[in-house]
Amino acid sequence: MTYSIVARDPGTGQLGVAAQSCYFALGSVLPWARAGVGAVATQSMVDPGYGPRCLDLLAGGVGAAEALERVRAADEGREVRQVGLVDASGAAASFTGSLCIDEVGHAEGDGFSAQANMMAGPGVCEAMAAAFAATPGSLATRLLAALVAAESKGGDARGQMSAALIVVEGERHEHPWEGVLTDVRVDHHPQPLAELGRLLQVAEAYHLCDVAEGALIAGDAAAALAGAEAGLALLPGEGNLLLSYIGALIGVGRMDEAKAEVQKLVGVRPPWEGVLRALIQRGLVPLPEGVTLDQLFTPPAG
């Protein structure tokens, strides 16, 4: 039915969860994560309540194993559940009910737990564990690699449909919705893992865009330009990223290039002109002294 992995990155403290299933929109019920607290995967005959209940216990100082045991003990349907969680220290815990459907199992390791049920064949959890341990890069990259490894062993006996991946910061925040670094999901797709990988790249591009906009607001136009360029390298032609790039070009005084990019943006979708005018009029994209709005929208000479 489903395979998943929860993990903590020892270098950054980041926490994450990723999963795939031949089930519609598993991202709406299976993955749970809270910055500086933990990550939970609840699956099989899923009870979404395991997510917030376990996270609340972890936030209160209860360790992973005890948190899972407390929630499991209160669940009369525990034998059809499968759950994995990891806490902010990297301690992992998992449970597979006796009524979960074969091939079924879980594998815990240093800072992670992989779990699977209704698989096409054996070795799925072990493949996830090995791929997670061997893959370099960010936590999101390693989580996705674990999912790909699971699919290489046959994956869900019914096939593929949906996937999700969440990564949160290692430091706790005041509110549980804060500190989310990555939250992407595929609800219905013939190749959900490939689509999840594409969305991770889109998410990274937009993260760079957010960094660029923050730098521009802080008055660091050079950093804004570097961030916008990096984002566009990942996602060429994306309108929102082009808007950040234009703002950064204006900030560093490269007006002819900014005008050229404005023409490209407005040429593809004319209503962007109104958006950019509104941002400038409200001071969110400041123009250099002596440059007017109309001049910005005038094509550069030559």
Task: Show the residue positions of the predicted features.
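Residue-level recognition of tetratricopeptide repeat
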Residues: 213-214, 247-248, 280-282
